[in-house]
Amino acid sequence: MLSKEALIKILSQNEGGNDMKIADEVVPMIQKYLDIFIDEAVLRSLQSHKDINGERGDKSPLELSHQDLERIVGLLLMDM
């Protein structure tokens, strides 16, 4: 999970971010949303990788690349 401090720093880097006030109850909701988004991105990237490259018979670790994420990110953003 992204730390509260890191999340606040990221949110405050937008235009006019110095004047932005973030309510304490909002941060856990944003953290949860980001956790769900990241989990979904990983699962979709994994499925896309398997669809393109086929199932592997061995049990060696699977390595995802930025290309796997690029294939799914457009639809993922629309779905979220």
Swiss-Prot record:
The keyword DNA-binding applies. InterPro entries: CENP-X (IPR018552), Histone-fold (IPR009072). One of its GO terms (molecular function) is DNA binding. Keywords: DNA damage, DNA repair, DNA-binding. GO terms for biological process: DNA damage response; DNA repair; kinetochore assembly; replication fork processing; resolution of meiotic recombination intermediates. It comes from the Eukaryota. One of its GO terms (cellular component) is FANCM-MHF complex. The MHF histone-fold complex is a heterotetramer of 2 MHF1-MHF2 heterodimers. Together with MPH1/FANCM, forms the FANCM-MHF complex. Component of the inner kinetochore constitutive centromere-associated network (CCAN) (also known as central kinetochore CTF19 complex in yeast), which is composed of at least AME1, CHL4, CNN1, CTF3, CTF19, IML3, MCM16, MCM21, MCM22, MHF1, MHF2, MIF2, NKP1, NKP2, OKP1 and WIP1. Belongs to the CENP-X/MHF2 family. DNA-binding component of a FANCM-MHF complex involved in DNA damage repair and genome maintenance. FANCM-MHF promotes gene conversion at blocked replication forks, probably by reversal of the stalled fork. Component of the kinetochore, a multiprotein complex that assembles on centromeric DNA and attaches chromosomes to spindle microtubules, mediating chromosome segregation and sister chromatid segregation during meiosis and mitosis. Component of the inner kinetochore constitutive centromere-associated network (CCAN), which serves as a structural platform for outer kinetochore assembly. This is Inner kinetochore subunit MHF2. The gene is MHF2.
